[in-house]
Every structure is written in C-alpha cells, then in structure tokens.
Amino acid sequence: LDEVVNPLGLRWFKFDSEKGFFLNGKGRKLIGTARHQDYFQKGNALRDELHVQDVLLLKEMGGNYLRVSHYPQDPVIMEMCDKLGIVTSVEIPVVNAVTETEEFLHNSVEMAKEMVRQDFNRPSVMIWGYMNEIFLRRPYTEGKQLEDYYRFTEKVARALEATIREEDPSRYTMMAYHNMPQYYEDAHLTEIPMIQGWNLYQGWYEPDINEFQRLLDRAHKVYKGKVLMVTEYGPGVDPRVHSYQPERFDFSQEYGLVYHKHYLNEMMKRPFVAGSSLWNLNDFYSESRVDAVPHVNNKGVVGLNREKKDVYWFYKTALSRRPILVIGNREWKSRGGVVNTAQKECIQSVPVFSNAEEVELFVNNKSLGKKKIEDNYALFDVPFVGGENLLEAVAVTGDNKLRDMLRIQFQLVGSQLKDEAVPFTEL
C-alpha cells in the first residue's frame, strides 16, 4: 500500500497591479526572504529540524512570504509554510542562461509539470516561478546569434507559461529579471508572466542606491497592468565587520542597516509593489565568491550557522506586532578602541532596535538619556571603559515595560603610549 496525506487550506487571494496582494479579501504587503537550503559545514544535506528552524526564523522575523529559490525544496519546508501561514512561490532551476536545444526545452517543461503536480495541494503556494535572471550570462552580445538566442529563450518561456497555466489555472506565474530591462523587453519576456519579479541591487552592485526607487517607478509606468514584486535585493553583511562611516561594499553591519532601511521604506511607500523577498534568509556557500568570507555569499539576515545579524533585528522590529527591544551588535561582545574622551573612555555607537516610541539606554548603571526610535532603531554613542561594560535598554509600549541587557568586554588603548591612566599593555 502507498498513502499520500494532503493538507487542506481554505483561502482566496489575488494580485492587483495597482494595489498589490490580497488574502481573503484583505490587503497584505508580502515581505519575506528567498532561501537556499544550505547550512554551516553541511551544505545542502539538511535534516528536517534544520528546515523547520529556517521557516521558524522567517516567522519570528515577521516575514509572511518565502521565495523557495531557485528550485523546489524539501517537502518539510512547504509543510511548515502551510502550518504557519506563510505565502510561498516555488520555481524550477532555469537560471542565468538557456541551452539552445529541444532537449533543454523538453526538460524544462517536464520540470514545470513535476513542480506543479508535487505542490499543487499546498495552500501556501500562490505563485509558480520558472526563470531567474535568464539573461545574466548571455553567450552573445549582438548580431544574428543574439537574435536567435532571444527567440529560443522566448520559446522556452512561452512553453513554460502555457504548461503551468494548463496544469494550474488558479495560481499566478512569475519570472525574475535582473537589472537590464532592455534585454527582457527585446526578447518579449516582460510580456509573458502574470507577475514581474525584479532582482535589484542598486547601492551594492550598482553605485546609486536611489536608482532603486526610480526603477520601481519606471517598471510601474512602462509595464501597465503587470503585477510587480522585488524578488531579490540586499548587500553582503559580515557580522565581524563594523564601520562608523559605512559605505558600499564594505560588508559592514552598519551599511547593511543603511541599505535595508532605504529599500524597505521605498517599497512600503508604493502600494503597487505587491511584495518582496530579500536575498537571502541565510548566508550560503557559493564557490566562486571572493567576498569578505571566501566561497560564501553573505547577504543573509542570518549567518551560515543561523546567528542573527543586525538586519534581522531591523526587520523583526519593523514587521512584528509584538513589543520588541533588542540591543544590537550582539555578536560583538569583545571590543577595543583608543581613548577619545577626557574621562578616559572610548565612545562607540551601538544600535538599539525597538518598535516602542522611545528607548533609554544605561551603561554601567548610568543613563545616556532617552532617544526617539526612527526607522525601527535608535543609535547611541556609548562611552566604554576598560573591562566589563553592562548595557541595559529600557522601553515602554502600552502596559509592557521592556528590558534587554548586554555585557561587553572592552580593551581600552591609550591615545599615547606614555598615558599613565591607561597603561600600554599590548600591540
């Protein structure tokens, strides 16, 4: 005997090119992440509990959408999204380029059929995806070869669109483009799917972060009637790296906050942006990468071993309905710095994340005063002394008094070697 147990979920949904996403008649901005099934020292071979942990991390963050990318993943991922009410899109691995053969076309169509039939009964699935950045690695740049390549890619796309709509007319289709809209327009790919997904990295791979919102507005104007989602965005963030003058490609926690704050604010301003999936839930192995950590793409809001970065707390504070108070830089518990005050202290900034209106920070039982929360966090200039420093944050939301504490060991270095108050001990 063989047995299949299917979940039952009753819901109705729709996408609108002007007003975004609606679930059971209520407007919902989809905010979430993409995800690779990758883990520290384990690669892709994960036990069920690690898959479960990832979906719980997304739920805890306040995310309501998971882009299962760029391939169907373990069934336990889908099971958890069904149980936790997380909207999902699932896609087949047709990524970066096509092979101009009928065998490639046939295989792609078969993958699309298998994907839909595998997860057809999943109530969490509302989008089927089938191409990601398909012109990122074009083998040709001009002439007849490029024209033929475009024509074949369009043929594959239309075959996949038709296949998915025939297999499942109740759900939406989506294709994810990269930041070269002209390529996709020339091949007519912007016309085909029901949802346009845009992978945008202005302020990271592209220099001007403000080009992000200009591209959103252009897409909304040019592709009238098309639903728009931001399917990828995000900078690399190494939790070991900090900067008090954050800038593009420094991989600092601080630039990660600057970037994500800008993107989230711009997307929330625009009701026509139906949703977004930041890249990525977790850091993941990528052999060709030569970033802050070799062979690792560290755009995740959590690390390979799932330690939470500051950008995770930023999103949790922005998206959660529960009262939140968290002192940031939690992994940076052993610090050092040069004396920069007359009181023989070293001032360094520390973010405090909260959805309260204001927060008060105490350092070694001395108040640094209260600060208004702006864009989900307040930044305090903390005067560290040598040795152990106790940070305590206090905030009030309604009837809830919130507290968070963090102990930091600080190595104070004199501004001059002859400073008797801060004796020189090490290089």
Can you say where each PLM-predicted feature lies in the sequence?
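Non-catalytic C-terminal accessory domains or segments of carbohydrate-active enzymes
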Residues: 393, 404-427
